[in-house]
Amino acid sequence: MPPIKNKPSVFGEQLICDENDNVIGQEEILLVTASGISTEKVVKKVAEYNGICYPAHIDRSSFSILSNLGTIDEYFGFKCAEIYDILKEDELNKKHPYLEKLKILSDSDAHYLENMRIPQQIIDVPENNINAILDYLNKKEGDN
């Protein structure tokens, strides 16, 4: 990331919190800039840490992988994608048939608690823990 200093009045505070959500500092470098790491490298690196990486708010007209690249290629290795408006899923699948192979998630994209909306989607996992959620997300649509 380029060493650009954050302007909290413009971009908001970038707080560093401990495991108990206590604020322990602030990140001074602006984190919303582009990185020099390719998408495929990010996906692979996240997988090395047993995480999952997926493109967010792909239905948005700006700052989304679809608005920037025009497509989501199988090459990236995504197993799911997130859309803001779950009602747009069928429309997106028609324009981008590859999406039918992915699990589609939807959330509020809220950056503040007061902006969160009522959930439009619930995932069904056998246990209430992170491993069950990651197992669910790591399976492509149609996998058992």
Regions found by a protein language model. Name each.
Residues 23-35:
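Surface-exposed cleft-lining segments at the edges of enzyme active sites
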